[in-house]
C-alpha cells in the first residue's frame, strides 16, 4: 500500500493491517521453504509495507505530522 493510503487509516486499523502483514509474511516464508512460492518479490513488498505502517504509527506517537 502507498503511505498516503495508510495515513488515512486510524491507529486501530493500522495495527490490524500490521497483524495481517505479519501473517502474510509468515505464510510467504513457509511457501518459500516448501518451494511453492511463485511471486518471489512479494515478501520484500510485505516487509516494506510493515516498515511503512510502523513508521506512521511511530510518527503519530511522537506527534510528527507529514
UniProtKB/Swiss-Prot annotation:
Keyword match Oxidoreductase: no
GO cellular component: cytosolic large ribosomal subunit
Taxonomy, superkingdom: Bacteria
The keyword Manganese belongs to this UniProt entry's keyword annotation: no
UniProt-listed InterPro entries: Ribosomal_protein_uL29 (IPR050063), Ribosomal_uL29 (IPR001854), Ribosomal_uL29_sf (IPR036049)
CDD domains: Ribosomal_L29_HIP
Biological processes, Gene Ontology terms: translation
GO molecular function, one term: structural constituent of ribosome
Swiss-Prot/TrEMBL keywords: Ribonucleoprotein, Ribosomal protein
Family: Belongs to the universal ribosomal protein uL29 family.
Protein name as catalogued: Large ribosomal subunit protein uL29
Organism listed in the record: Roseiflexus castenholzii (strain DSM 13941 / HLO8)
